[in-house]
Amino acid sequence: MKEKDNFEMIINLRKIKTGKRTGRSKRAVKFIKKVVARHFNAEKVIIDPLLAKSISKNGNDKIVSKIRVVVSKIEEKIYLVRLAIKSR
């Protein structure tokens, strides 16, 4: 199987949006960590601060519904999640 060193994925945050209004951005960051850990079998997931800020750009209770991220492998079972920049 091919090793996933640099991988781009879209994470749907709609389930987080349907939940309780308070603390949505914090739950979204935890959800992103959980999804990346599940897909890449990671022990540690590091979230870029720019990604955390872009999730809650309209406030902590008004998060985006989908987010495109790039997952990069730092070391064995340690991954960095960054915001993907659209290129056209």
From Swiss-Prot:
Listed GO biological process terms: translation
Keywords noted in UniProt: Ribonucleoprotein, Ribosomal protein
InterPro entries: Ribosomal_eL31, Ribosomal_eL31_dom_sf
One cellular-component annotation, GO: ribonucleoprotein complex
The protein's name: Large ribosomal subunit protein eL31
UniProt lineage: Archaea, Thermoproteota, Thermoprotei, Sulfolobales, Sulfolobaceae
Top-rank lineage group of the source organism: Archaea
Assigned protein family: Belongs to the eukaryotic ribosomal protein eL31 family.
Listed SUPFAM superfamilies: Ribosomal protein L31e
GO molecular function annotations of the record: structural constituent of ribosome
